[in-house]
């Protein structure tokens, strides 16, 4: 299904209600303009991709070891974020002030999802990262599934291109999130065919991992 202006307006109204079911979550459907999205994708695609996972990724700031336990290794500090990423990280911190000690977003994970690819349901490593997680979507729309770790309540959220998700409080620590490995999403009775999607996850690395 193509997302027209009318469809997007209706979806935003639905999403506003759905997001309220997840305490600590903020959703900005059009955080980045179409031009900003295109510029970011162009920059990202000029960088080298790693095939560490079953999908392409890029890591900046610190390397996160993707495993069952997950860890950030201080010895694998990659240096400061590149200018394009640092600029966006500072913008996020201004728009949504951090309450942590350092108040600096210093780790970025870029994921590329081709149609049919997804990620397991998870909570971002609690001892590794601060209390605010930022997720930006570029390219295709996609449904992300939030599951309460205790009640198992499920809340699907449609991530629109250029959208921003902010996870704090219960949304950060109690709700798992993941993306099914599918080429098609169903949301609110409508079908959305996936194309290439790139996500940016900004986080703050905690001591003693630095």
Q: What role is predicted for each listed range?
A:
Residues 1-210:
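Non-heme Fe(II) oxygenase metal-center motifs and adjacent flexible, charged/small-residue loops
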């Amino acid at each position: 299904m193509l997302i027209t202006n009318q469809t997007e307006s209706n979806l935003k109204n639905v999403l506003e209600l759905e997001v309220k079911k997840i305490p600590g979550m903020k959703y900005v459907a059009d955080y980045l303009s179409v031009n900003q999205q295109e510029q970011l994708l162009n920059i990202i695609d000029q960088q080298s991709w790693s095939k560490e996972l079953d999908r392409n990724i890029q890591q900046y700031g610190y390397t996160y070891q993707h495993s069952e336990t997950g860890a950030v290794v201080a010895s694998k500090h990659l240096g400061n974020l590149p200018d394009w990423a640092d600029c966006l990280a500072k913008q996020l911190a201004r728009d949504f002030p951090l309450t942590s000690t350092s108040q600096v977003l210093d780790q970025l994970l870029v994921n590329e999802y081709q149609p049919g690819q997804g990620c397991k349901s998870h909570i971002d490593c609690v001892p590794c990262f601060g209390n605010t997680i930022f997720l930006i979507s570029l390219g295709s729309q996609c449904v992300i599934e939030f599951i309460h770790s205790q009640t198992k309540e499920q809340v699907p959220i449609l991530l629109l291109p250029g959208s921003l998700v902010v996870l704090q409080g219960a949304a950060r620590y109690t709700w798992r999130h993941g993306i099914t490995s599918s080429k098609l999403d169903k949301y609110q009775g409508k079908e959305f065919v996936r194309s290439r999607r790139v996500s940016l996850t900004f986080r703050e690395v905690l001591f003693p991992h630095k």
